[in-house]
């Protein structure tokens, strides 16, 4: 655990700027085995306005606060002091925020230590086999659930608020379009037809970290509901049969530096739209909304 990194890049898997992740590597006999990570929503990240979600005037990603692309905050077991100076000098209520960040690192370190002890106890071979088995198990469950649906294409559209005072109706109501293609034990969720990105409002949804999560969550909740199927491990294996595509530059796959801090608002509507599409083929399994 010689280094620890910080990451909040919305265009590289993080959800949005205030959700900061701290990553601690897990080594076994000098080989990198895994990462232990904590993520927390922080009170401030040095954005245009105070707070963490009310940045409605953000016209680009730079106005949404400091951006960290997996930068090291510890190196060789020691703090990278300039990074911590940068945090304290550019974040409001920095004592509180930086203290929370230190707590995150401590939690991630604890997780890394516990995982290391687990590997030492059972051995790397057994650990790797168990990881593969649990991922394959979840994949089988999802494939079985998808295969139980009739092959076909199922679509739905939802409109979200855009520029409400604009004379052009196409800019007042922005479509989110979902087409689900079921073929055998695999599913493709296509977002073609979704409105283009909004370059000066923070409602864009990065494909990785927002759109994919909204889709995976909804499909899992419909096809493998916990009340019906019991506990199902949630990880990469579960979503292997689900493929997602979206036109580059649309609201669901924006191009940097389009602002994204309010991505959860259209993200919830996207999840509802996936639910509506699945209602065509699994009406008894959907809810009234997310």
Regions found by a protein language model. Name each.
Residues 18-21:
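Short, small/polar residue-rich loop motifs at catalytic or cofactor-binding pockets
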Residues 113-196:
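Accessory "access/gating" subregions that flank catalytic or transport cores
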